[in-house]
Amino acid sequence: MTDSDEDALKVDQGPSQDIPKPWVIPAPKGFLQHIFGTSQVFQSICDVKPKVTGLTVPLKVREYYSRGQQCLEQADWETAVLFFSRALHLDPQLVDFYALRAEAYLQLCDFSSAAQNLRRAYSLQQDNCKHLERLTFVLYLQGQCLFEQCAFLDALNVFSHAAELQPEKACFRYRCMACLLALEQHPACLSLITEELKQDTTNADVYILRARLYNFLQKPHLCYRDLHGALLLNPKHPQARMLLQKMVAQAQQARQDAGILAVQGRLQHALQRINCAIENNPLDPSFFLFRGTMYRRLQEFDGAVEDFLKVLDMVTEDQEDIMRQAQRQLLLTYNDFAVHCYRQGAYQEGVLLLNKALRDEQQEKGLYINRGDCFFQLGNLAFAEADYQQALALSPQDEGANTRMGLLQEKMGFCEQKHRQFQKAEDHFSTAIRHNPQKAQYYLYRAKSRQLLQNIFGARQDVATVLLLNPKQPKLSLLMTNLFPGMSVEEVLSTQIAHLARLQLERMVEGSLQAGGPQGIVGMLKQWELERQKALALQHSWKQGEPLIETSEKLQATPEIPQVEPGSSEGQAEAPKEEEEKEEEEQKEEEEQKKEEKKEEKKPKLTPSKVASLSESYLDQTSLASSMSFRTTCTSETETSAICQEYRSTSATAMTFSDSSLLKTQSSDSGNNREALSHGPRKIKDIQGQRQSLSKTQATQSQRQNFSKTKAAAHRRNSSKTKATQGQGRRSSKTEATQGQRQSSSEIETSQGPRQEPSKTKTTRSPRQRPRKVKAARGRSWRPSKLDATQGRRRGLLRSSTKTEAFYDSNWSLSKTEDVQGQGQRTSKAEAAQGKSRGMSSTSSKAESTWGPSPSVSKTEVGQDLTYYEVL
């Protein structure tokens, strides 16, 4: 205060020296005494006191200062403010008085006045940091009071002013953040926090503050990032752990919601929820796996692939299940993406995607099938075939793979047909049939190829199969016309070729079903049902096959009836009257044969007068053309009658063939003989209506084979029909119809033994018989001779014509039976019937009765014999 007083004195001395005193009239001496008299009261006034110059203002300031200090010490804040204000009024440049008055205002909680005084003091002395610090402190107190009074905007202004005065202090910015949060100005607060983190990155609290703000703003991925940063700075931060647990719980809830929405089919909403879960907890790979699956189902393949690859990067060794699922889903994504490209026509891109999938998985058949489809569309048929084969190797019974392989083989077959490679085309169509045996068009295409390859039998068989599968197949009528001219669908289906085609088709279908095996409970039920149906069908066939079984059993019971000698037990069992009647019949037959021979000598060699049925002729042509060297022809009714008569005398001789010539086909002789033995003429068309089932045919075949083998062991020949029918003599000549392997005449002669001599007629029955090229026809009606009917009635050993026809009809399915036995021989329903001629005399009849050989007859004799029966 001394310096200030001296300054005040100097200020006072200046004007006293400069300003001149005014001139006044001096008062006369004794004037006051004259006025006041002798009173001493006013005498002092007149005394002139000495004037103190330069000490008036500083003394007052000093006085106010001392009094103000006393008031501060006495907590008399208002009086202190008064004295400091008077002092500042006397001297406004006194900085310390502003600071003292600010303290008094601060104690009075007048923060604004205090801040104003401090601001004045700081403005007068800017180099004094104490005033600035005191000012910011006052502002902080003021802002905090306002904040507590919920005056957030005023508090924000105060804190902002303090932060401007001291930007190095973060506490003022933190208070500003709090004010902004209270004011719900989140973007401004977020920007302020971001600026703060740019300046200071070591404060975990700031990260947590921003993480909470992000979580409030539903930005969990940013929240998790800041939370992760806070945990890196302070792993044991309690607030950070609490927030982390909260986010994990939110993520699990979002995952559950996404699963429910996905089950409901609301994939877009499920995707939103799983995104929220990933944002709350981006370190869980299962969330990315689920989202990748959603992307795949929504056909957002890029996002799906990215998520699955991220899962493979995130999983650890103890998460093998998630890794396998991610790999599986990645393969499915590649596959679905390839399918999408396939639908869009981008086949090459589909191949590339499937190559990626197959690089990691080689045991998935669907990948090979889809890549094969892409190759098929690109025209790379070889690659497509390789992929389909690989798929079938993994799953042989896959319906899709078999269907695609069939289509591929069909296309490859067409390509080979264009290049006129018909054999290769047939192979391709056969492969297609093997993979899809119930596709009718494959058989139709193969039939065309076989027709061009001159495989008529195979072509007809394929056409029959097409009729079985789909009679309304387009372009079938043309092949029907070429291969079965003049025949209807019913007639074709009644042929032996149709039976063979049906059998092969059933075998292929059953084989494919058995190879697949039952798949689960449904497959087992289907298999049981199929077995039950088979059992019912077999039982039904047994019921229908009673006549056939009865006939075959009787044949087995008397296998050597044609070869019975007069001294055998069976011959002795016959009545003596029957033997006498047989001798009389033999004599009559000899007389009739002599007459017939004379007539035949007068006539030239006969030509066929009646054409066989179309079905039999086609079948015989196809089967015989491949295994025999001669062609059969049809015979007239007269010729067949003559053959019947001759067959009765030579049926036993025909049974001397060896086992190598199995019973395969029927000759016209057996049919004629049976018709001759019946009580009345019956047509073969009626016999066709009594066609037996497959099981009956097989049973009859086996019985006939045993019968023929038994007779072949005997090596005996019967010379007459009467001899052949001694004992029980029923339909023994029927088995002769099975000589159908297109054997040459030399082979037949060899099997007959040394009793036959080679001749121009190629005798196969007896030396007196000459084979005729006659084609057996089922549709023609044969008329037996009166003599045959008479002989049949006389003997009384013959069955009814119905049983004979039933047994005869069963022999017509021999070629089909042979296919069942696996012999693989192409046989026809009826082989070439060997024409027979007899010029029987009394000596020849005696020789025949004693089983002796007889010389061969000439063509003239045969002609006479046939002429005789034609006249009858």
Swiss-Prot record:
Keyword Translocase: no
Keyword Repeat attributed: yes
Record's compositionally biased regions (Acidic residues): 577-590
Listed Basic residues bias regions: 762-783
SUPFAM superfamilies documented for this protein: HCP-like (SSF81901), TPR-like (SSF48452)
Compositionally biased intervals (Polar residues): 610-640, 653-675, 689-709, 721-754, 799-827, 839-861
Disulphide bonds in the chain: none
Highest taxon, organism lineage: Eukaryota
Pfam families: TPR_1
Region called Disordered, residue ranges: 1-20, 557-640, 653-872
Biased composition (Basic and acidic residues): 591-604
Record's keyword terms, sorted: Repeat, TPR repeat
Residue windows of the TPR repeats: 61-94, 96-128, 136-169, 251-284, 285-318, 331-364, 365-398, 406-439
Entry-linked PANTHER family: TETRATRICOPEPTIDE REPEAT PROTEIN 16 (PTHR45153:SF1)
Protein name, entry field: Tetratricopeptide repeat protein 16
Organism: Macaca fascicularis (Crab-eating macaque)
Gene responsible for this protein: TTC16
